[in-house]
A protein has these predicted regions:
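Mobile cap/lid helix-loop segments that gate and shape the active-site cleft of serine hydrolases
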Residues: 201-202, 209-212, 224, 260-305, ...
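C-terminal catalytic histidine-bearing segment of alpha/beta-hydrolase fold enzymes
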Residues: 336, 340-373
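Alpha/beta-hydrolase fold nucleophile elbow
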Residues: 233-244
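N-terminal targeting or regulatory segments adjacent to alpha/beta-hydrolase or S9 domains
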Residues: 19-103
Length: 373
């Protein structure tokens, strides 16, 4: 009886197990066949690149008097970036510290009821020489290394300028450090950018839905801070310095400023055509549709006749591991286009190229201090 029960129950079970194992083997064999069948990258042609853009308002593409070109190109850039007439917001001082002989003031500006943005004002020792006011614009990372918290590729340049006698305003940019998520105080919502972990860069992409760009909104913030700087510290003119994304902003924001005296732009100004597909830059640099009208050389040219330094580290070149690569093959062509614009205004000698030997994507403090002397 027991044998019969065993046969009745065990044999079907063994049969089912055998069938399942056979099915798995067959499925694995079929999957291997399917995998071999699938199209491989090696069978494709993957050399895509966008064709050359029209650049309809680039200086070398238009037949306009220089002054007329400047008016029309500035108006188009203002339209693309959606720069509006703005006033500085209310600013409060949170606290103050003395650091390496410099007084650093922590500031907050109210943009609207849903957003405040920070900045640091660095006041030099009053016993030393008093030099120009400076807007110091950080790159990807945060503002804190510019004022001396740590030494990274910024090399504490806001602090070094203040120690040299400059009155320095160093704003935190949207998308970075304490502003790395503009919806951080809302449950679930995320408008993040440089958060140091997995990110969809929603601060950038959400803005695109409304026709805005992160760089355009940041330019408006810098103009607000400049107005506050002028009104509260009697700043009639100022110098501007930035590196990387801050270098982009050091070229773009002064186009809409009437107070800028000199510009030191590090790690920027090659053509837009290379910064994403060739140099693997992050999306904050993007100005949607810009190449339909102009390139970086034209934007920089809108600052004519202001003296401008374009600075690079000799080793900041394209490679599989370099996500800046600002000193790329488009730099010298862009420089020639910029010089052409400055020459048309009788200011060709006001454009300088400085390449620091043996350096990567990093600020050159001695060259910066010398230029702003």
């Amino acid at each position: 009886m027991c044998k019969r029960v065993l046969i009745v129950f065990v044999l079907p079970l063994l049969f089912m197990i055998g069938c399942k194992e056979a099915s798995v083997v067959a499925q694995e064999e079929n999957t291997e066949l399917l995998e071999e069948f699938l199209i491989k990258k090696t069978e494709l042609n993957l050399r895509y690149s966008h064709p050359p853009a029209d650049r309809r308002l680039s200086f070398h593409n238009v037949d306009l008097p220089p002054e007329r070109w400047k008016i029309e190109a500035k108006a188009k850039l203002k339209e693309i970036l959606k720069i509006s007439e703005i006033d500085s917001g209310e600013v409060e001082e949170l606290r103050k510290i003395e650091f390496q002989g410099v007084a650093i003031h922590a500031l907050l500006m109210k943009i609207d009821d849903n957003l405040t943005i920070p900045a640091y004002l660095l006041v030099p020792n009053p016993a030393g020489p008093q030099k120009s006011a400076v807007m110091a614009i950080h790159g990807h990372g945060s503002v804190e290394p510019t004022i001396g918290l740590v030494d990274d590729y910024h090399h504490c340049y806001a602090l070094e300028l203040a120690k040299d006698g400059h009155l320095v305003l160093a704003p935190e940019l949207r998308g970075f450090s304490t502003l790395n998520d503009l919806a951080d105080h809302m449950e679930i919502n995320r408008l993040d950018y440089w958060i140091g972990r997995y990110s969809q860069f929603t601060l950038v992409t959400d803005g695109f839905l409304y026709g805005n760009s992160l760089i355009g909104e940041t330019v408006e913030d810098l103009l607000r801070w400049e107005d506050w700087f002028a009104q509260n510290h009697n700043v009639k003119e100022l110098d501007v310095v930035g590196i990387s994304y801050g270098g982009d902003l050091a070229i773009v924001y002064p186009v809409f400023s009437h107070r800028t005296r000199k510009i030191f732009a590090s790690g920027t100004m090659g053509s837009f055509t290379a910064i994403f597909e060739r140099c693997y830059n992050a999306p904050a640099h993007c100005i949607p549709g810009i190449l339909e009208w102009m390139d970086r050389s034209d934007i920089a040219g809108l600052n004519v006749p202001r003296p401008v330094v374009l600075h690079y580290g000799e080793l900041d070149t394209p490679s599989p591991t370099n996500a800046s690569a600002s000193y790329n093959e488009t730099v010298h062509g862009s420089l020639e286009e910029l010089k052409e614009i400055y020459k048309a205004f009788g200011a060709e000698d006001e454009v300088q190229l400085i390449v620091t030997p043996g350096k990567h994507h990093e600020m050159d403090i001695p060259q910066l201090l010398k230029f702003f002397e």
